[in-house]
Amino acid sequence: MANCFVGDIQGCYDDLRRLLDLAEFDPANDVLWLCGDLVARGPDSLNTLRFVKGLGNRAVTVLGNHDLHLLAVADGVAPLKKKDKLQELMEAPDRDELLEWLRHRPLLAEHPDLPIMMVHAGISPAWDARTARNCAREVESLLRGDQYQWLLHNMYGDQPDGWQDDLVGIERYRYIINTFTRMRFCYFDGRLDFKCKKGPKESTPGLRPWFEQREHHVDDPILVFGHWAALMGNTGKQDIKALDTGCVWGNSLTLWRYEDDALIATPCPTYAK
């Protein structure tokens, strides 16, 4: 059995299927791990969701910022933008079933037997692994419960940008969501920045990647994430895997296979501007 981790798909369904064929992914024996942002910007978010949902327990996916935004659009919280290419999904007969499935995806996923943790954007430098787990479960329970509409209506915003253990209510939940789904850079005091989307070498002075700000512990799991296409898979750390390589921007879609540490990519020139 192989554990195959894939970066942001963003509706690039044909590229996903081509990559899985290239990696000889076998849904009867292997497990597909997806770093979130299944939808938006690419041409076929609908079939991407249908395919991943259809894999059942052979697929594990975490929520990304575009996935949460889709839920907000469907609930009337946010406008449907033409550039997101979600109209077909919004009009699909199985729309509600797909969105209900998506709403129940986690913010953080872990392998039950292997030292691997997966999120969409990252883990706050202020958190250890245990805090990250607990924070993820807090917001997941809201998304899956009766308060999910309230959460979708109030999740947008950049504040607070710093963590305190005594944060409560929507400020706490917004920080948790932003950390797991939007974060790239931090200031040296740990505050989150949401403006700079470039790579570390081109970043604004005073910022550093969130994974450079985190303390490393010997027993930390391998951390797999997506979201940050400008990294092009480069973190400089063996135990931190960045898998968003900008498929929807015309670069490539990348798969990392845990068992043999193989990186497999397929070019996606169709989407190049």
Swiss-Prot record:
Major enzyme class: hydrolase
Keywords on record: Hydrolase
Gene3D superfamilies per the UniProt record, alphabetical: 3.60.21.10
Superkingdom: Bacteria
One MF term in the entry's GO annotations: bis(5'-nucleosyl)-tetraphosphatase (symmetrical) activity
InterPro entries in the cross-refs: ApaH, Calcineurin-like_PHP_ApaH, Metallo-depent_PP-like
Statement: the UniProt record of this protein carries the keyword Hydrolase: yes
EC number of this enzyme: 3.6.1.41
Family: Belongs to the Ap4A hydrolase family.
General function of this protein: Hydrolyzes diadenosine 5',5'''-P1,P4-tetraphosphate to yield ADP.
Entry-linked PANTHER family: CYTOCHROME C5, PTHR40942
Protein name: Bis(5'-nucleosyl)-tetraphosphatase, symmetrical
Origin species: Aeromonas hydrophila subsp. hydrophila (strain ATCC 7966 / DSM 30187 / BCRC 13018 / CCUG 14551 / JCM 1027 / KCTC 2358 / NCIMB 9240 / NCTC 8049)
